[in-house]
Swiss-Prot record:
InterPro entries: ADA2-like_ZZ, Ada2/TADA2, Homeodomain-like_sf, Myb_dom, SANT/Myb, SANT_dom, SWIRM, TADA2A_B-like_dom. A zinc finger (ZZ-type) spans 12-69. Residues 70-122 form the SANT domain. SUPFAM superfamilies: Homeodomain-like (SSF46689), RING/U-box (SSF57850). GO terms for biological process: chromatin remodeling; mitotic cell cycle; regulation of cell cycle; regulation of cell division; regulation of embryonic development; regulation of protein stability; regulation of transcription by RNA polymerase II. Residues 347-372 are annotated as: Disordered. This is Transcriptional adapter 2-alpha. The gene is TADA2A. It is found in: Nucleus; Chromosome. Residues 347-359 have a biased composition (Polar residues). Zn(2+) 2 binds at residues 31, 34, 55, 59. There is a cross-link at residues 132, 138 (Glycyl lysine isopeptide (Lys-Gly) (interchain with G-Cter in SUMO2)). It comes from Bos taurus. Interacts with GCN5 and NR3C1. Associated with the P/CAF protein in the PCAF complex. Component of the PCAF complex, at least composed of TADA2L/ADA2, TADA3L/ADA3, TAF5L/PAF65-beta, TAF6L/PAF65-alpha, TAF10/TAFII30, TAF12/TAFII20, TAF9/TAFII31 and TRRAP. Component of the ADA2A-containing complex (ATAC), composed of KAT14, KAT2A, TADA2L, TADA3L, ZZ3, MBIP, WDR5, YEATS2, CCDC101 and DR1. Interacts with CCDC134.
Length: 443
């Protein structure tokens, strides 16, 4: 509504021109780059390119006018304000004097328009915001549903996850034990009295200064932990694992400098190097295509398919060396053959590889007392027991896969493995379980 300027018909109510100091008459110009205060010019000063201090003649500008309809197509904004001012001056019902003061409308038009828009239906159907927009903007009267927050997690006191979080209490946003927790002990016996000597007084003040420096260090460490999101360590580690191995090594090296550059700058630095790594890998792939004489992506897809086929053939030729490892154990050899048959038929290996000399398969994980168990259903508990995965880690992996699936509209196994980066067999079982239960969909 800035372009309305002043609706008043009195020129003295409008701001003066900065060029000639005359009263502004619509339309006039407002500089869009200067201000505050706003920089107004009349048309004459604007056309001759008036400049003053920081204002230049090539600045962008706005045309200030009230010559447009607001409530009725046949009434301009200037006439609306003139009608209201005339009613205030002449009184309600004195429509002849109102029309004489306006000069542009008859008394019948003034009465009809005023009664319609300001008495019978004031500012509802005729305002700039229609009823539909007003209904959408209306605040709902229903209760706001409550959703428990899991970030940061709220483990039970003295649980394993609580110890991993250094005793952090999310409800209080503080720790059970502070850094340098006994810093206050040095002050417990200090008492300032008037008969202290200058040396003793200076010594006590030095102890207080040391205590203040220890408090500053405590707050500095808290700020670093909060700014960098180190409260939920497992979530932090999960985010770190989404990078390739080379970027993870850089992440580990540069972590000690994160407190210096700040969280945003540190994340930008890591993301830029991750992008650089992706670009280098893509350049290397394109160089491989060019070395092989490939100049278009259609041929590149054929090349990748044939290369993958050659790799599979090479792996099959090395199976003999694997068989030789179990040649002395007939039972293990039969298990290996059945496992390879399942793989060739596209099934997951149903027989785990064991040998008389090897270790036994691990028993199912006991979930009793582990944090997060109460958030799992029976099928999820069974999955965590079989793959020996703690509930907290499973919930983080599940959340990461769900977010990625919603973002991409589907998820492939290769994407899941690149995202959570744990044992590939465990990843496959988690991925198959989430697909089977309908949590995610295949891409």
């Amino acid at each position: 509504m800035d372009r309305l300027g002043s609706f008043s018909s009195d020129p003295s109510d409008k701001p003066p021109c900065r060029g000639c100091s005359s009263y502004l008459m619509e339309p006039y110009i407002k500089c869009a780059e200067c201000g505050p205060p706003p920089f107004f010019l009349c048309l004459q000063c604007f056309t001759r390119g008036f400049e003053y201090k920081k204002h230049q003649s090539d600045h962008t500008y706005e045309i200030m006018t009230s010559d447009f309809p607001v409530l009725d197509p046949s009434w301009t904004a200037q006439e609306e304000m003139a009608l209201l001012e005339a009613v205030m001056d002449c009184g309600f019902g004195n429509w002849q004097d109102v029309a004489n003061q306006m000069c542009t409308k008859t008394k019948e038009e003034c009465e009809k328009h005023y009664m319609k828009h300001f008495i019978n239906n004031p500012l509802f159907a005729s305002t700039l915001l229609n009823l539909k927009q007003a209904e959408e903007a209306k605040t709902a009267d229903t209760a706001i549903p409550f959703h428990s927050a899991d970030d940061p997690p709220r483990p039970t006191f003295d649980s394993l996850l609580s110890r991993d979080m250094a005793g952090y209490m999310p409800a209080r946003a503080d720790f059970i034990e502070e850094f340098d927790n006994y810093a206050e002990w040095d002050l417990r016996d200090i008492d300032f009295v008037e008969d202290d000597s200058d040396i003793l007084h200076a010594l006590k003040m030095a102890v207080v200064d040391i205590y203040h420096s220890r408090l500053k260090e405590r707050q500095r460490r808290k700020k670093i932990i909060r700014d960098h999101g180190l409260i939920n360590l497992r979530k932090f580690q999960l985010m770190e694992r989404r990078y390739p191995k080379e970027v993870q090594d850089l992440y580990e090296t540069m972590r000690r400098f994160a407190r210096i550059v700040g969280p945003v700058e540190h994340d930008k630095f890591i993301e830029s190097h991750a992008l650089e790594f992706e670009l280098r890998r893509e350049i290397k792939r394109l160089q491989e295509y060019r070395t092989a004489g490939i100049t278009n992506f259609c041929s590149a897809r054929t090349y990748d398919h044939l290369k993958k086929t050659r790799e599979e053939e090479r792996l099959k030729r090395t199976m003999l060396s694997e068989v030789l490892q179990y040649i002395q154990d007939s039972s293990a050899c039969q298990q290996w053959l059945r496992r390879q048959a399942d793989i060739d038929s596209g099934l997951s290996p149903s027989v785990p590889m064991t040998s008389n000399s090897g270790r036994r398969s691990a028993p199912p994980l006991n979930l009793t007392g582990l944090p997060g168990t109460e958030k799992l259903n029976e099928k999820e508990k069974e999955l965590c027991q079989m793959v020996r995965l703690v509930p907290g880690a499973y919930l983080e992996y599940k959340s990461a896969l769900l977010n990625e699936c919603n973002k991409q509209g589907g998820l492939r196994l290769a994407q899941a493995r690149a995202l959570i980066k744990i044992d590939v067999n465990k990843t496959r079982k988690i991925y198959d379980f989430l697909i089977r239960e309908g949590y995610i969909t295949k891409a």
